[in-house]
Structures are given as structure tokens and as C-alpha cells.
Amino acid sequence: ARNGIYKIIYVAPERLMTSGFLSVGAAQTVSMVCVDEAHCVSQWGQDFRPSYLAIPDYIKTLSHRPVVGAFTATATGEVREDILRLLQLQAPKVLVTGFDRPNLYFGVLSPTDKYAAVRQYLLSHPDRSGIIYCLTRKTVEEVTELLCEDGFSAVRYHAGLDPEERRRNQDDFVYDRARIMVATNAFGMGIDKSNVSFVLHYNMPKNIESYYQEAGRAGRDGEPADCILLYSGRDVITNQFLIDQSEPNPDLSPEQQAEIRQRDKERLRQMTFYATAHSCLREFLLRYF
């Protein structure tokens, strides 16, 4: 990298301000910095990462200011304002495309037996490939085991698996050797599999941003696809517990942490409104963003 043989370097923001990486920037002319998942810079974003706040500091260490681009698939107006301000973008051109994807069908079910509902759906769509998102690793393990026992071609993915199994299972799904991926939200970043024709949420996510981002992995080939949430009141309790038990961020003050926790609870409330809505779900999502 220091010798300039790479045209593109992918790097986690956590590494930007390390001495090793700073020397790379000092040795080369950087023509452009692209920030993916830019919503992570905002405390109001669904995946706030303090390391994103250091990106402007890194840019200032370069010999000249490069073109800076920031991209995200899910950002409310409030988060978009934060992206402009916190990344210190200069005279930016802001492009916001429509959030509506007409080929996606959105539905919510409240079955007494979630696995039975999933099994019935898969039997009714025998040739379709898709993702089943679960809230916890334990649920991923349970659902994958049941699917395999019932003869479905399913693999699992969560942060508790060793990297080699995660890579193997991801490849099996992406290259159509496995029909179904059962995963936590650890799966999906950077995955662009065009023929995902359904995304089932076995549990309700903690916010609408995460739900829409995960559901949006369906139908990227433009063909009709299903995005179905299996909702139960227990999902709300589990999410509330996860919010309350989330590890404190040492980079934030106690006041900031309390504010973020309160924000997360409000987002969970909005997600619950979606899951229990009696109106058009597509309209609900478009209104939210």
C-alpha cells in the first residue's frame, strides 16, 4: 500500500488513526475517501460507531483534501443532517433516492407457532432462496437445526461461529449451494446476492432502520419478493432487555449513553407500531423515512 500499487484500499474506520495506516496516507496521494454505512457517524443512527467521528481528523492529515463521498441505504432526515455536519462535508451535493421498492411485498404475521409458519412458507415456495433473520444466536441454532431435520437446505451465520465456518456458509448461500441462510444481523454487510426472493424475520428487530435494511436484501434482481415479519409480544420484551443490557461505550459520557438508550427505546416503540399497524405497511415505512 505504501508503494502505491493499490488503486482502492478498504479499511475499517477504527484503523484510520493508527500509526501504521497514517504512514500509508502520508506516503501517497489520496484522491477520494468514500464512507460506506455513513449513518454510523450519527448518534441518532441505528448503528452508531464513535470511530466514524475520527474520519474528518484522518482527512486533515492528508497532504491535500480529497473528494469525500458518504453513502447509506437507510437514513432519516435527522441522520442525513448529522452526516453532513459530523463528516464536515464541504459544499456537498446531497442525493436522496426514493425508499419505495415496488417489487417488495411487506407483511406481518403473528403465528402461535413461528417455526410452523416458516415451514409452511418454505413448502409453499420450494424453489426460492432467502434469508431468515433471528434476534439471537440461540434462535439461529434452533431454527437451523429444525430446518435441516425437515430436509431443507439451510446454513447458519452469527458472530459466535468460527470465521472459517462463517465464510464457508456465506459462500454456500451466495453461490446457491444452500437455499436458506439463517442468521443474526451479523450477516448481510457487503452481501449482494441478486436472487434473494424472501426475507423472513423470525423475531422483530429493535428498530425500523435495521428492519428495512435487512428486508431490502430481497428482490435486488427486480423480481417480486416477500419481506415478512413474524411478530410476538415476547420480541418487544427481548429487545427491551437487550437495550437495557447493552455494553456502555467508554467513548461516551453517562449522559450521552442514557440519551442513546432512550432513543433506542423510542425506536423500538416505532418498530412495535409497525408490527401492530392496521394500515398499509409500505406507507408506514415511507412515512418514517
Put a short name on every predicted segment.
Residues 247-289:
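C-terminal accessory/connector segments of nucleic-acid motor ATPases
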Residues 1-256, 266:
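Helicase motor core with emphasis on the C-terminal RecA-like subdomain
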